[in-house]
């Protein structure tokens, strides 16, 4: 199930750096994290769905690259995003 537009708008509003910001690394990582979290129950129920798992791994990889970029460019924003999304312990 895809992320609903209302939920997507809320995520963008929460993590945007400006009023019309939809492409900052924070927004992209937050949207990817939401999609990854929505897909997790699907893979617990459908363990042999390798085709969709490949898409999930692609999303995880893309999120990792965005986080690496953010960490290299602005460590404070990186730490704030990690804490807000609860990605690291």
From Swiss-Prot:
UniProt keywords, alphabetically: Ribonucleoprotein, Ribosomal protein, RNA-binding, rRNA-binding
InterPro entries given for it?
Ribosomal_uS15, Ribosomal_uS15_bac-type, uS15_NS1_RNA-bd_sf
Judging by the UniProt lineage, the source's domain of life is Bacteria
Molecular function terms from GO: rRNA binding; structural constituent of ribosome
Cellular component, GO annotation:
cytosolic small ribosomal subunit
Task: Kindly list the biological process annotations in GO that this record carries.
Answer: translation
* CDD domains tied to this protein: Ribosomal_S15p_S13e
Instruction: Give yes or no: UniProt keyword Ribonucleoprotein.
Output: yes
A matching Pfam family = Ribosomal_S15
What is its quaternary makeup?
Part of the 30S ribosomal subunit. Forms a bridge to the 50S subunit in the 70S ribosome, contacting the 23S rRNA.
Query: What PANTHER family does this protein's entry cite?
Result: RIBOSOMAL PROTEIN S15, BACTERIAL AND ORGANELLAR, SMALL RIBOSOMAL SUBUNIT PROTEIN US15M
HAMAP family listed in its UniProt record: Ribosomal_uS15_B
What does this gene product do? Answer: One of the primary rRNA binding proteins, it binds directly to 16S rRNA where it helps nucleate assembly of the platform of the 30S subunit by binding and bridging several RNA helices of the 16S rRNA. Forms an intersubunit bridge (bridge B4) with the 23S rRNA of the 50S subunit in the ribosome.
Q: Which family does it belong to?
A: Belongs to the universal ribosomal protein uS15 family.
Q: What is this protein called?
A: Small ribosomal subunit protein uS15
By which gene is this protein encoded?
rpsO
């Amino acid at each position: 199930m895809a992320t609903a537009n209302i939920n997507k708008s809320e995520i963008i509003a929460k993590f945007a750096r400006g009023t019309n910001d939809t492409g900052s690394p924070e927004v992209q990582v937050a949207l990817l994290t939401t999609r990854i979290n929505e897909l997790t129950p699907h893979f617990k129920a459908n363990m042999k769905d390798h085709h969709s798992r490949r898409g999930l791994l692609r999303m995880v990889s893309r999120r990792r690259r965005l986080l690496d970029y953010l960490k290299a460019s602005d460590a404070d924003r990186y730490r704030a995003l990690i804490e807000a999304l609860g990605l690291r312990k």
